[in-house]
Amino acid sequence: MNTLLQRINISTTKAPELIDITDQVEEVVAASQIRDGVAIVYSKHTTAAIKINENEPLLLQDMAHFLEKCAPRNGNYLHNDFTIRKNMPDDECPNGHAHCQHLLLGTSESIPIISG
């Protein structure tokens, strides 16, 4: 079985930010010359998620509102209480809401590759 590991770097400017990476994934698959298999798209960050859905502007707004309702940015998260947290990185930010939102979404999608 042929395998390929390719990194796609995505920069964000706000939270939440819903970014369509379809073109980048399709380019990697095409360049790989793998005709049949599975593309696994994965985010290694604990506050970034991978989901397949429709890229329709009003739906994207609905999704952002849904995430905010489920885990509001201004909610009370122990993760954000830096007076009680231990072993934090120097650049830590109060992002408990983003970790909780991530629980709803997940880190990866498996996409079948059929005939390229």
Question: What residues fall within each predicted segment?
Answer:
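Active-site histidine-anchored catalytic micro-motif
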Residues: 1-116
